[in-house]
Regions:
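Cyclophilin-like peptidyl-prolyl cis-trans isomerases
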Residues: 3, 30-31
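Flexible, glycine-rich phosphate/dinucleotide-binding loops
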Residues: 21, 67, 176
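Exported/periplasmic cell-wall-interacting domains
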Residues: 44, 64, 78-79, 94-95, ...
Length: 198
């Protein structure tokens, strides 16, 4: 009877194991873990942050073909971005102000703050890599363009990163060399462009 509840059977088990071996597991498999060291030869120098949108993962390049991999939430289809930028500022317990200017600023360090425990500010206006109290959004296309991380993961990443660190977002690993030679370029989310124009 227990086998009937799981309609996948042996075929599903084999497919699941193959998917884990080939793709390195699904986005949800890491939701409770800190960064995981993996083999990832993406062709970028150590210290680079690479976001692979279709995997919903962020890689911190450690060097020698290795990276620290974190599950993340990326922008929704309308706000998904690709390109190369860099970390322009870093804050512990950052305050959050609504993008549209309406509403009060939420002070840093409280559990309901949408930016979580740490924020890495990117050179593109309003874009950040930050923590979140919305753990269920990790592994999804759920944000307005920011990259959300579990609070424990962004705290760990914060200690590895420095201001000026390159940040590259690509749609898939096939695009790994697309932004290697460019400084700041790519497609920003619509709201970030609007904010830059103000």
């Amino acid at each position: 009877m227990a086998a009937r509840r799981n309609s996948w059977g042996w075929r599903g088990l084999v497919l699941a194991l193959l998917g884990t071996a080939v793709l390195g597991g699904g986005p949800g498999d890491e939701a409770a873990a800190k960064g995981r060291a993996v083999r990832a030869d993406l062709g970028y120098p150590p210290g680079t942050i690479v976001i692979v949108n279709n995997e919903r993962r962020l890689y911190f390049i450690a060097g020698e073909g290795r990276a620290i991999r974190y599950p993340v939430a990326v922008g929704t289809r309308r706000e998904l971005w690709v390109g190369r930028t860099f970390v322009s500022n870093m804050r512990k317990n950052p305050p959050w102000t609504p993008v549209d200017g309406g509403g009060a600023t939420v002070r840093g360090g409280i559990p309901s703050n949408p930016l979580g425990k740490r924020a890495l500010y990117l050179d593109w206006s309003l874009l950040r890599i930050h923590g979140t109290p919305s753990r269920g959004s990790i592994g999804r296309a759920a944000s307005n363009g920011c990259i959300r991380m579990l609070n424990e993961d962004v705290i760990e990443l914060y200690e590895r990163v420095h201001i000026g660190a390159p940040v590259i977002a690509i749609n898939s690993r096939r695009e790994a060399d697309r932004f290697a030679a460019k400084r700041v370029t790519g497609k920003q989310p619509a709201y970030a462009k609007r904010a830059s124009a103000r």
